[in-house]
C-alpha cells in the first residue's frame, strides 16, 4: 500500500507541476486526485487551501470512499469538492480526476450555460478525446454551480456512467472536471478541452472582426 501510494503521489505531483506551469491554479483554485486502491477505494486528493504552484510534502491527503482522511490524525483537510471525486471513483472506471478554473472555461460555461452543453466539431484535437470518426462531434455538458457542494455533486453525478473511463463536465462560472483511466489520460482530456475553449473563443472573435 505504501509503495502504491508513493507511486501515485509522484504521478499526481507531476501532473500538478505541469498544470501549475500553465498557470491554471488561480488563487489556490482547483483540485486533483488519483486512485490508490480499488478495494477498498482510497485516493489521494489535493489538500484544501494550498498554493498548487508550490510543491510540499503536504500537497495531497489520502482519503477513503467517503472522502474522509484515512489517517484521522492528519492535520490536513481534503479539498472542499472531494465529494465530486468520490463519485468519479465509485461510478466510473477512472483512475484520475482533475478540476481547474481557467478564464476560457469560465467564459465558455457562461456563454453556453443556458443551453446546458457546448458542441465541438471539425477540429483535429477532438481525436485526443477518443473520437476518431471524420467530422466527429463532441458534446460537453454544462451544469449549474450551487454553493452547497452536495447539490453540486448530485448534479455532477448524473453525467457519470459505470462503463466510462474518461469524460468531462463543465460547471458554470466555476471550472471543468475531467477524469481518465490514468493521470496522463486525464491530463490529455483536460488539455484537449482547454485547447477547444481557447480556439473557439478566438475563432468567434476573429470571425466577427472579419465581418465588420
UniProtKB/Swiss-Prot annotation:
Keywords (alphabetical) are:
Amino-acid biosynthesis, Lyase, Metal-binding, Methionine biosynthesis, Zinc
In terms of domain of life, where is this protein from?
Bacteria
Q: Quick one: a GO biological-process term for this protein?
A: L-methionine salvage from methylthioadenosine
Identify the GO cellular component terms for this protein: cytoplasm
Pathway participation? Amino-acid biosynthesis; L-methionine biosynthesis via salvage pathway; L-methionine from S-methyl-5-thio-alpha-D-ribose 1-phosphate: step 2/6
Record's catalysed reaction(s)? 5-(methylsulfanyl)-D-ribulose 1-phosphate = 5-methylsulfanyl-2,3-dioxopentyl phosphate + H2O
The record's listing under Pfam families reads: Aldolase_II
Cofactor-binding details, from the entry: Binds 1 zinc ion per subunit.
Keyword Zinc listed: yes
The top EC class, named as a word, is lyase
Chain residues that bind Zn(2+): 99, 101
Q: List the EC numbers from the record.
A: 4.2.1.109
Molecular function (GO) terms for this protein are: methylthioribulose 1-phosphate dehydratase activity; zinc ion binding
This protein's cofactor list reads: Zn(2+)
Signal sequence residues: none
How does the record describe its quaternary structure? Homotetramer.
| NCBIfam families (UniProt xref) | PRK06754.1 (NF005244), salvage_mtnB (TIGR03328)
> What function does the entry list?
Catalyzes the dehydration of methylthioribulose-1-phosphate (MTRu-1-P) into 2,3-diketo-5-methylthiopentyl-1-phosphate (DK-MTP-1-P).
Which family does the record claim for this protein?
Answer: Belongs to the aldolase class II family. MtnB subfamily.
The identity of this protein, by name, is Methylthioribulose-1-phosphate dehydratase
**What species does this protein belong to?**
Bacillus pumilus (strain SAFR-032)
